[in-house]
A protein has these predicted regions:
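N-terminal topogenic module of multi-pass integral membrane proteins
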Residues: 1-71, 204-205
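Membrane-helix interface and helix-disruption motif detector
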Residues: 4-11, 41, 67-85, 105-109, ...
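Alpha-helical transmembrane segments of polytopic membrane proteins
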Residues: 10-17, 49-50, 83-87, 138-145, ...
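Hydrophobic alpha-helical transmembrane segments and adjacent interfacial helices
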Residues: 24-28, 55-70, 93-100, 118-130, ...
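Membrane-interface helix-boundary motifs at transmembrane edges
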Residues: 34-45, 102-109, 160-174
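Transmembrane alpha-helical segments of multi-pass membrane proteins
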Residues: 48-55, 87-88, 113-120, 180-184
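Membrane-proximal helix-loop-helix units in multi-pass membrane proteins
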Residues: 80-148
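Terminal transmembrane helical module of multi-pass membrane proteins
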Residues: 131-208
Length: 208
């Protein structure tokens, strides 16, 4: 029977960075309306969503589950089980988000998708605020919960009206979603920066 040594190198920073890149691509476009959405922009954003936000998180989620089960090198931190669930689920759902954006598909089903992801986000913030030193990741999950609340409003275009000239009023939910994407994306960049410095250079910054 082989014994695997515990590892302090859980690869969460790759997931933080990948999702942060996705948010900082999607967020400004949603908030500012630039570049204006068309087929080319949607295909470009779709590719980034699939590979950066999707694949990076999915890879980390699978890696964590393997490191918690088959090769138990991360079992000293039980909160990583929640991280594995979140990275796997968020990664897979970004495959769908990115592909739908690439294809120009209807975004309304995203509104229903947001409901279970609010649940996962609340689960994450509950676990990490309780975990020792886990509040920075708790803040992240709080931001993610807000993202999915605004995703619901944006996807169903709540409050959008058709004006007398045929134009539509501003989708406030989309603007709020974009602003939240930017803020959470910046927090993800901070978590990437702080956690990498803590592990690689012995810093003691608040991080994962």
């Amino acid at each position: 029977m082989s014994t695997f040594p515990a590892s302090a190198f859980a690869p969460v920073v790759l997931g933080f960075f990948g999702l942060g890149v996705g948010y900082l691509i999607y967020g400004p476009q949603e908030f500012l309306g630039f570049p204006r959405r068309d087929g080319k922009v949607d295909r470009a954003n779709g590719i980034w969503g699939i590979w950066m936000a999707g694949f990076c998180q999915f890879l980390v989620g699978v890696y964590l589950f393997v490191g918690l089960t088959w090769f138990p090198v991360f079992t000293g931190n039980k909160a990583l089980y929640t991280a594995a669930l979140a990275f796997s689920a968020y990664g897979i759902h970004w495959f769908a988000l990115g592909w739908n954006r690439y294809q120009g598909n209807d975004s309304r089903p995203n509104g229903f998708m947001s409901i279970p992801f609010i649940v996962v986000s609340v689960l994450g913030l509950t676990v990490f605020y309780k975990a020792d030193g886990g509040w920075p990741v708790g803040v992240l999950f709080t931001g993610l919960a807000v993202v999915y609340v605004f995703e619901f409003a944006a996807s169903f275009r709540l409050g959008v009206r058709t004006l007398a000239d045929g134009r539509e009023s501003i989708n406030v939910g989309e603007k709020l979603l974009g602003a939240t994407h930017v803020l959470v994306g910046l927090w993800l960049m901070y978590l990437t920066f702080a956690t990498t410095l803590n592990i690689s250079s012995g810093y003691h910054l608040p991080g994962a």
